Amino acid sequence: MFPAQEEADRTVFVGNLEARVREEILYELFLQAGPLTKVTICKDREGKPKSFGFVCFKHPESVSYAIALLNGIRLYGRPINVQYRFGSSRSSEPANQSFESCVKINSHNYRNEEMLVGRSSFPMQYFPINNTSLPQEYFLFQKMQWHVYNPVLQLPYYEMTAPLPNSASVSSSLNHVPDLEAGPSSYKWTHQQPSDSDLYQMTAPLPNSASVSSSLNHVPDLEAGPSSYKWTHQQPSDSDLYQMNKRKRQKQTSDSDSSTDNNRGNECSQKFRKSKKKKRY
């Protein structure tokens, strides 16, 4: 097979193109049928794009699949015409019967599709393009194409961006409970009521240093409720009183002994000074 004939068997004719259609849009669209090697939109002598072009695939099997998949879909409101290229070995075959031997797809459903792009069960692929050189219409087309071939993005927007609870709600033990009756996208927040022991731990104040030093005991009043309390003083026993009085007496005697020792020392020093004065005379 000659190279020209082989390339013609891998190429499809795309007609009835709207003036805003660019080669990048056709590349993204026909990439669903298989890997591409070249996309061309014919132009006149003045450089203006014509209403037809050619898409060359890497494999000839992708040609019949592209015709069955994309023939008749609408780009900018105009249905495109996808056929075999003139001169190929299969150009005489009807376009709606060429793909039945490979995949059973009714191309009539795609010709009547009123959407911007056709449906496909294959995952959408993209190729890197310089964003600065693309028109605004291409990004609109690519955005709509992404929503068609990605069912995850068809969920309600607020389902994926539901606000997370802040630190205050997390600390107060908030639980997320979905409302099944209202639908999958609705939800409600229910507050978990703290138990009596939690209320007691949060509301009961701690004793200060004075109350701790005076040997105070915290006794909760169960009859008044979990958040009420009273303070009771522990009375010392008889043995404790005896020890306290004994310590006081020992302290008093030690103070008196130290005072008498000081007086004796002063008297001795005075006598020593007087004896020195007498010796001088």
UniProtKB/Swiss-Prot annotation:
Signal peptide: none annotated. Its main location: nucleus. The keyword Metal-binding does not apply. One of its GO terms (biological process) is RNA splicing. One of its GO terms (molecular function) is protein homodimerization activity. It is found in: Nucleus, Nucleoplasm; Nucleus speckle. One of its GO terms (cellular component) is nucleus. Keywords: Developmental protein, Differentiation, mRNA processing, mRNA splicing, Nucleus, RNA-binding. Residues 187-217, 229-242 have a biased composition (Polar residues). Residues 10-87 form the RRM domain. It holds the Pfam family RRM_1. A motif (Bipartite nuclear localization signal) lies at residues 245-280. It comes from the Eukaryota. Residues 184-281 are annotated as: Disordered. Expressed in brain, hippocampus, prefrontal cortex, cerebellum, spinal cord, testis, mammary gland, spleen and kidney. Also expressed in fetal brain. Residues 271-281 have a biased composition (Basic residues). Tissue-specific splicing factor with potential implication in the regulation of alternative splicing during neuron and germ cell differentiation. Antagonizes SRSF1-mediated BCL-X splicing. May affect the choice of alternative 5' splice sites by binding to specific sequences in exons and antagonizing the SR protein SRSF1. Homodimer. This is Splicing regulator RBM11. The lineage of its organism: Eukaryota, Metazoa, Chordata, Craniata, Vertebrata. The gene is RBM11.
